[in-house]
């Protein structure tokens, strides 16, 4: 629960930076030119993109099962491949690049243990995909509503220690 609250808080904070992707940004005396570098803007954009990944993954599964042509199994496997790609790439790199300064048996034993851990992480990622997508949608929608409509409670921040204490009560 602490992780989820922290993630929600961070996504809200990232989306409050949305105006900083434009050429004019809020200033103390009204709009002023944005002085952020292109790299800084790219980092903001990348955080926004990353906050929508679980939503996009879940939508891909749902649309593949309901609207896309062909067998739903094909779309499911494609979606699973996309979710598993980081783990698969890491495993393949570990298999083809063994260290030269260590013996292979302990190394590949560790790779095997990492494979089991990665499979467990992948399973949990899939089990919690809908929940994590909901957390992201809620955080994004709440922020956009507050920024565009109510203009209230934009700085609804809690420190990690406050979140942790609230959970343990």
Task: Name each model-derived stretch.
Residues 130-140:
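Alpha-helical transmembrane segments and their membrane-interface junctions
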Residues 1-122, 126-132, 146-161:
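Non-transmembrane catalytic domains and loops of membrane-associated enzymes and transporters
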Residues 163-166:
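Juxtamembrane membrane-water interface segments that cap and precede transmembrane helices
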């Amino acid at each position: 629960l602490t992780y989820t609250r922290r993630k929600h808080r961070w996504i809200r904070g990232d989306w409050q930076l949305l105006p900083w992707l434009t050429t004019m940004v809020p200033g103390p005396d009204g709009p002023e030119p944005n002085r952020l570098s292109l790299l800084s803007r790219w980092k903001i954009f990348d955080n926004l993109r990353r906050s929508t990944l679980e939503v996009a993954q879940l939508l891909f599964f749902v649309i593949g099962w309901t609207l896309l042509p062909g067998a739903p199994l094909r779309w499911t496997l494609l979606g699973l491949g996309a979710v598993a790609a980081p783990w698969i790439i890491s495993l393949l790199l570990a298999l083809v690049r063994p260290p030269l300064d260590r013996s292979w048996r302990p190394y590949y034993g560790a790779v095997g243990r990492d494979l089991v851990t990665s499979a467990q992480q992948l399973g949990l990622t899939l089990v919690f995909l809908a929940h994590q997508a909901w957390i992201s949608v809620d955080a994004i929608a709440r922020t956009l509503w507050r920024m565009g409509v109510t203009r209230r409670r934009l700085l609804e921040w809690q420190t990690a220690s406050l979140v942790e204490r609230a959970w343990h009560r």
